[in-house]
Amino acid sequence: MTQSPVQPPPPLPAQPHSAAGGVIRGDVQVRCAGCRVILRVKTGVVEFSCPTCQLPQMLPPELLSRARPQFPQSPQQPPQPIQTLPPPIQQQLKPLNLPRPPVPAHGIDPTKMQLPCANCQAILNVPHGLTRFSCPQCHVELAVDVSKLNRSLTASQSHSNPPTPAAPTVPPPPPPEEVNEEAIEVEREEDEGGTAGETFMDYRPPKLSIGPPHPDPIVETSSLSAVQPPEPTYDLKIKEELERSKALSCLQIETLVYACQRHLQHLADGTRAGFFVGDGAGVGKGRTIAGLIWENWKHGRRKALWISIGSDLKYDARRDLDDVGATCVGVNPLNKLPYSKLDSKNVGIKEGVVFLTYNSLIASSEKGRSRLQQLVQWCGPEFDGLLIFDECHKAKNLVPEAGSQPTRIGQAVVDIQDKIPQARVIYCSATGASEPRNMGYMVRLGLWGAGTSFSDFNKFLGALDKGGTGALELVAMDMKARGMYVCRTLSYKGAEFEIVEARLEAGMEAMYNKSAEFWAELRIELLSASAFLPNEKPNSSQLWRLYWSSHQRFFRHLCMSAKVPVTVRLAKKALSTNKCVVIGLQSTGEARTEEAVNKYGLELDDFVSGPRELLLKFVEENYPLPEQPEPLSEDDSVKELQRKRHSASPGVSIRGRVRKMAKWKPDSDNESDLESEADSADDSNDSDDEFQICQICSGEDERKKLLHCSECDKLFHPDCVVPPVIDLPSEAWICFSCKEKTEEYIQARRLYIAELQKRYEAALERKSKIIEIIRSLNLPNNPLDDIVDQLGGPEKVAEMTGRRGMLVRASNGKGVTYQARNTKDITMEMVNMHEKQLFMDGKKLVAIISEAGSAGVSLQADRRAVNQKRRVHLTLELPWSADRAIQQFGRTHRSNQTSAPEYRLLFTNLGGERRFASIVAKRLETLGALTQGDRRAGPSGPSLSAYNYDSNFGKKSLMVMYRGIMEQEKLPVLPPGCSIDEPETVKEFLTKARAALVAVGIVRDSVLANGKDVGRFSGRIIDSDMHDVGRFLNRLLGLPPDIQNRLFELFTSILDVLVHNARIEGSFDSGIVDMKANSVELLSTPKTVHVDQMSGASTMLFTFTLDRGVTWESASSMLEGKRRDGLGSANDGFFESKREWLGRRHFILAFESAASGLFKIVRPAVGESIREMSLSELKTKYRKLSSLEKARTGWEDEYEVSSKQCMHGPKCKLGEYCTVGRRIQEVNVVGGLILPIWGTIEKALSKQARHSHKRIRVIRIETTTDNQRIVGLSIPNAAVETVLQDLAWVQEIDD
């Protein structure tokens, strides 16, 4: 909106009169449209710039009459636009600290529209394009009808006269309509989109019927099950053999067919296409690989490379090959072979499987020969055999996050694929890539590169990041549709999950508090000790890195130890009910134990305390000590002095130095001998005239009699020195001045060294005291040794870990002894396999597994094993990453088992410990999304996503919390344990929270101010810490449990608020959502909109008709059913809205849900609402109907009207495209192959008017008549034409 500016007239001559409150009568007050400060504007000033924020603006219409002067304006002076006000007028505008008027007027912001509020009539500055907002004055929700506004503006412009220099007037726009609250609520729910449905479906190969059924129930995520793989065309050579032996199940044979079929294809760059086996742990990937090797062997491809994570797994490889009948195929472990040519006479491997680990892939000999070169040479450039990456997540960090380097293994995996381009690549892993960036090494899938939508991996990654979790889910579906991916998982049916909270016992809590206190004091001690060091800075960062990593490990140990009593109790309970126990942990504490054994010997009084040894090691090696000085002997003193002398003023000539320093007694008292050392030093290059030359010295005959000082190297006349020298000395002579200085220097040096020694000894004493305190602290023993001991010792407990030795209690019960884990009969390499066998044979009923010792180990209740007791799997320590969590869960849950395990996930009631669960939950979320097509997948049991704090919302919550604690912003929630009626409780909490954050090094440079701000706290949190949830949760561990839990609760409360708000705004990414309706019908035959050239897979556009309504009869029977079952409450029934909208009221059915006090809402047009409503909100917005007849009429009327129009009424600006509250609607879904057309759809959606329509949304929809399920991208009705046009263009290019 533009208006011609007005030249302000000269100020009125009349004297202003003061008004009440100090406001000058005739002036007007206006609130700045930018910074909202109240300004006083002189009479006649219509346009002005705010002196505070410099925003140019105008007076609003209601103040124009008061601002306009009462005399005519001179027509001769043309108006000039005002950029900034002239100084006199600038001075007339002063911010006022006055009480706000009841309805303060706002300045007009020329960049926005000015519209009156429908309720209080205040003129509002409304940004262009904003259609819904609340009035800041009276808080009524308002909506703008854009079409009416445009008509109004057009009309006002067509009737306007040529511009005159008169004061500007604002054309009156139509008042905004009051918002239909019910329409907004329904719209929000539609934007959020449906509910998260069931995650898994039972699995059977859809297009193959060869082979026996799998021995255990297998499931697939419902997203993936909605996608059909391509038609199988490959004919297996070993088909008849497999049908006879029944060695492979139907789903393992399906993998063989699709993998071999995929290996017949080539990517656009000429390399052979690869296949990804993403089956979950325990489905039988090993036997599937053996089947592939046997099939290729039959085709004459007799060389294969099998890369896995541990050399122990070669025994499993041998077993699997024997099971499928490939007994003649040799398995050659590479780690036992020399670096020479594998097919040479010495080594003699002409064919068979070379089995190696990922670490071998990057190994090289002393002579520089690498295993990678050796393998490539053995295969040859034309190699077209199998290259198997088993457990391929080991290569995951090829494309690392910012600031880190790609791993050598990741690089080697890509290199070997480049060097043998025709190899038949199999990627095989239950965890695949837990994040899309970890797919970087899967170059043979053809998802990026030549002939795809993404030129390189980074473009592919970028698209997925933008698409959110739904995009990850689509990648898995896409790969299945193109025949390059299978992903089935063992059903967790029968497996029981429970999260067990191990609350800190009283003794443990006291120990924890004492430890937190000690670490805080140690930090202060280290800070003050570092301050005495002269070169403190370089060592400082290293010291603090070690401090915080030790801090984290220490409290992690403590958390584990806190769970030992519960673990032992649960284990004994399981054993007493005829079950057996598997305990999973990550760290064994071996390093601490070995250090203690090296220090104290093989026999100890008790088990080693890991936390104590960790603290001792940190303090002993890192306490900042000043350098110990070396004492000076007499000889050293002289040498030191000479060194000092010779190093001084190297630029001065000896002759000059002699003359300057050989001072003698002057002849008269008129000459002053008070020359400062500084002066003499500065004059070294001046002329020699200023020196007094001794007449005797200058004589030729006397030159031979000069004395030479051995210290200062100067020459003196014997008679000129004080006192004079009569007999010339035969040995070294020192002048009086040097003799005096030498003694003085040595004395000072000795004092200095004594002071340094004193300081060093004081620091040493402090260090010794700290070590004494550490030794006196009551700290727990190593959890692993403790559990083994409490459950009966090594005779009863099978240990599968990576450690070499362990502490065992002596037979008399006194003291413990360190002994090797293996005996004479068993090598260290075989000890874990031996222990596993003892467990599977039932000779030991408790197994303890660590990540290092259990990779690939099967501990399920196997039908072939002696020990078929039900497994109780206790996770004492959740792994750092979900990759490892899945591997750990899969040890006890595998195919061919008599019973599924019971899982017990142990957490302490410490807020900070959830850090470890947070990482696992984050990984599980994206892991399920990518490798199993559905982000709620994880293992189909525990909901660990409740603990996912390390998300974007988590980072934002952390920042909000920090700012609130530092009192930079107001906290959006009341801190835990505080009362709104007692503000001092909040103040007290904030003080404690700041002190806690100082103690753990998050708040830096903290000081308490003096002077007028006495007691005021100052400190800062650096930007990188503001969003670092990991650091917050790690450091939180080091606080006493009380403040730790209060801080954590505050953080999660803020997170809940932010997530709730995001849901309301429709910006929360909830992955795949189900579209629910009473009737879902496919409207017409799906259109094929794109076909992939290589696989023949197509992209289809499906159009569905949904009827979401609930008839009066259905609603009545719902209510009747509740009452009949005795589940109803007095407040259940039919309600009508208190407010009318377009002359109509809305009707709902409300009944109390299981969550007491909250009501489920059913609407005639859209059925049951996702959001439940509180009783108070229900009574505020609706009134209960006593007349059923009135309820019926209103319900049926709304049911009928909503079939043809949306809730906004017949004049809705989106017209037929609007679906808000429309009972019958069309839904368009693009299904099938999505990845190749991703960019096209993204571009088309970006042009949509409604914000929620711009977002890529993945939905799942199922027809009610024939249960046809489609998963794909939702295309808003308004965008269908654009998408189809763009897709036709894409298809032409592809053709």
Swiss-Prot record:
The record's subcellular location field reads: Nucleus
GO terms for MF: chromatin DNA binding; histone binding; promoter-specific chromatin binding; zinc ion binding
- On whether Transcription is a keyword of this UniProt record, the answer is yes
* Gene Ontology BP terms: chromatin remodeling; epigenetic regulation of gene expression; heat acclimation; positive regulation of cellular response to heat; regulation of DNA-templated transcription; response to heat
Q: Which InterPro entries match?
A: P-loop_NTPase, SBNO_Helicase_C_dom, SNO, SNO_AAA, Zinc_finger_PHD-type_CS, Znf_FYVE_PHD, Znf_PHD, Znf_PHD-finger
Compositional bias annotation for Acidic residues: 178-193, 669-688
Report keywords, A-Z: Developmental protein, Metal-binding, Nucleus, Stress response, Transcription, Transcription regulation, Zinc, Zinc-finger
Membrane-spanning regions, if any? none
Instruction: Give the knockout phenotype.
Output: Abnormal embryo development leading to reduced cotyledons. Reduced maintenance of heat-induced (37 degrees Celsius) gene expression leading to reduced growth and survival in heat conditions (44 degrees Celsius). Abnormal nucleosome dynamics at loci with altered maintenance of heat-induced expression. The double mutant brm-1 fgt1-1 exhibits retarted seedling development resulting in reduced development and delayed leaf initiation, as well as delayed flowering time.
Note whether Zinc occurs among the keywords.
Answer: yes
Q: Where does this chain carry the motif Nuclear localization signal?
A: 643-650
A Gene Ontology cellular component where this protein is annotated is: nucleus
Give start-end positions of each zinc finger (PHD-type).
691-741
Identify the stretch(es) annotated as Disordered: 1-20, 68-107, 153-204, 626-688
As for what it does, the entry says: Required for normal embryo development. Necessary to acquire heat stress (HS) memory, by modulating nucleosome occupancy and regulating heat-induced gene expression. Associates globally with the nucleosome-poor regions flanking the transcription units of expressed genes. Binds to the promoter regions, primarily to the proximal promoter just upstream of the transcriptional start sites (TSS) and somewhat more weakly to the region downstream of the transcription termination site (TTS), of actively expressed genes (e.g. HSA32, HSP18.2 and HSP22.0) in a heat-dependent fashion.
Q: What is this protein called?
A: Protein FORGETTER 1
